[in-house]
Amino acid sequence: MLSRSIGKAAGGLVLGLSVAAAAHAAPLFEPVTVLSRAAAGSEPALGKLLATPSTATVQEVRVDAAATAQPQLEFELLGQRVQAVRSKVESLPDGGSIWYGQFRSPSDRLTAATSNGQDDPGNSVILVRSGNTVTGSIRKDGKLYRLRPLGNRHVLVEVDESRMPADHPADYNQLPKIPMGNNDRIGIAQASSGTPATIRVLVVATNAAVAAYGGNMQSLVQLAVAESNQGYVNSNVGITLQLAGYETTSYTESGNFTTDLTRFRNTSDGYMDSIHTSRNNTAADVGVLLINNTSYCGLASGIGSTASTAFAAVYWDCATGYYSFAHEIGHLQSARHDIASDPSTSPYAYGHGYRYEPASGSRWRTIMAYDCSAGCPRLNYWSNPNISYNGVPMGIASSADNQRVLVNTKATIAAFR
């Protein structure tokens, strides 16, 4: 009885403080107009965005980048007025910043739906500020929106994840299984993340990808790294991903994922050879090539990797929000898809992603899982039976524990450079 009274009193205090804080939420952006293909005119990047199958709606918005210095933000998601509160902020070496936050619940209080105390991934905001531009991923009730600069304006994009490209080309089924250091934890799944590890990634974007995106590609890369790190925190992985370097390449894409990835990985074939010098100079453990191939989301060099094979290619439009950037690095650490889509037990029988598909109610999947048969959002979590989402374990100890895989292999990949 005493604890209930304290809880009610504390709840009333929190609610009162939240309502007061809400009055001071800074406007992040205001709607201007919904854009149509007729509005694209001579703007190729806008035309491409509007023609992308996964684009549900594009709205021009007026952004106040300075608002990201504030702890509470307010904005409109296609007619729905929402407020978000900051959970943390990070400074970037280039003077920019990353704003992490959560939406307020209808009662004006924050919700945390996971058993590990992390914020709800279905109601989250990550924003990268660079000068007067803001690039971000926004999830509201599981729905994905993207905020991004496009030419001399900003747009809010509503994404239909059911129409995203397939995760991989058929070549995925022939990927080599590369043994990594034998650091497997004894026994069944454990909650510990072990010794922390830092993995450094060099990101190279083709000029075609930069042109097709039409925004601040470096900010998109920083967003991909930030999302990856949030996923590691959410799932108790104990990895920090660092952006070792970002550069562009004039390499002309072949139109084939495997060909482009092979040329990116090879050190002396006359294609992108200089990136290996950059990799050594920046001490990057992993290399990721961002390309403009709309056929698929990505491809890694193997299930597992060595220092000479730790390379992946990612379609830029899948890199953030859909988490393909982290997904492909996950493959390089030996993580596999959900077991229904990817039944191989090599190198780890438990190393699969996880899909939750109840007969009724909310469906979801983790980072490495393919889409549900009836569609479901991809949450920024790795499968982990020790963590629950809305009371449901996010994995199975014997077959779906990507967290355990990443913990097993992180020291090996972090020592590649």
Swiss-Prot record:
Binding site for Zn(2+): 327, 331, 337
Catalytic activity: Cleavage of Xaa-|-Asp, Xaa-|-Glu and Xaa-|-cysteic acid bonds
Key words of the record: Hydrolase, Metal-binding, Metalloprotease, Protease, Signal, Zinc
Gene Ontology MF terms: metal ion binding; metallopeptidase activity
GO biological process, one term: proteolysis
Record's cofactor remark: Binds 1 zinc ion per subunit.
InterPro entries: MetalloPept_cat_dom_sf
Function in brief: Metalloprotease, specifically cleaves on the N-terminal side of aspartyl, glutamyl and cysteic acid residues.
Name this polypeptide is given: Peptidyl-Asp metalloendopeptidase
Species of origin: Stenotrophomonas maltophilia (strain R551-3)
